[in-house]
């Protein structure tokens, strides 16, 4: 590769994730995006009936049964002279930690809103996470083939609840059975909707000009007039698109459409490739790393077990921050101080894996992991630096895991530690007994753990209630005081999967008392990986 080629390769990368409330249509949008990127030939309807293919991006056994994307997969596809990396985030309300971490690996997000429902609680939470890094947001108002709320009201709600300015790019003409298409405010064009084009891409009829009589013929006089009246109002009351405000995360361009009807998806893809930022610089402990730097750096934001049921393997997902990966190159695994030769990294089309010959800043590659890589690990071409800002949250729910066969204790521990390194669950081993306590941010995670212990480690386990209300990581600068604290609180102390000391409190009152009694000890609710 010539040196001139490198900036060009980086500049055409766009790495984004989709955030939404469960059932707002995220998986359908993911499919349609892949259809436009020529990554899949036909878009199957997500909850396929036995014979139909399941949605391409949901591939684990339990996901197949439940029809939810439990794990984050990565898909790369070309679009408009760009190379787009889409990180699929878990759509189920339980899987927040994995989602939060995925959002640290993208440069922009698409927020999908069910236009019949408006802003929902999960979207609010996810937006808070994107705020931590001022991630630019594009918005897609979905499901216009159903009856929706007033579009102006939807924009007002996004602005007041999510505290972000809206700049409509397209505007809907009717909805539900009367949905006729959208008008593009900046191109002065109307795109007409036809039903029944869900799984393939078809030519869309375009009418130029808002006052073109063809428009009245196509959508009917009433809807055409309604559109003109609404646009007068919209132009007066809403924000114009401003690229700088968008990049700063203060303004979101809004598109309307229906993912199921495969309409409007290309409009936001055009917006994404034209406006969303190229791979961005990233804060490390010693300096800021620019994506234009020639030397390779990257961080691991997710670990996933058994992406290939035929291979009992685990894959660490690494976001390339700078430089170029080439097959067989030597990288430094900074945390353990070892050099490793990476000869078989993977690139992704969800569920299909290909060996990566090369990857650039902004890309995600998969590293085969035999238990040495953890979330938050940094890889470089020799420099000692660690990327920051990959969070671990104190769990909110706890269960004790118990074996049906007590002789399998070793396999159980191995399985739980691996699942905790992967970020699927957190595991705590109390100092005073041989219990194994798992902590999660949502109930469904416990089911996932039990089912994966069985399928992947051949361990039959059950979970039961345990007297733990919350957990905090503890540290203290004064070793003498820390020793005293540890001696007096042994019954409440445990080690997590990474052997970090944790205080497990039976009640919030107990935690508050401990914090009052030991002011020199710091109790952390989150910690960096």
Curated annotation (Swiss-Prot):
Q: Where is the tr-type G domain?
A: 11-280
| Stored Gene3D superfamilies | P-loop containing nucleotide triphosphate hydrolases (3.40.50.300), Peptide chain release factor 3, domain III (3.30.70.3280)
Q: What Pfam families does UniProt report for this protein, alphabetically?
A: EF-G_D2, GTP_EFTU, RF3_C
List positions binding GTP.
20-27, 88-92, 142-145
Broad class of where this protein is predominantly found: cytoplasm
Location in the cell reads: Cytoplasm
What is the protein name given in its UniProt record?
A: Peptide chain release factor 3
Query: Which organism was this protein described from?
Result: Mannheimia succiniciproducens (strain KCTC 0769BP / MBEL55E)
- List the lineage, top down: Bacteria, Pseudomonadati, Pseudomonadota, Gammaproteobacteria, Pasteurellales
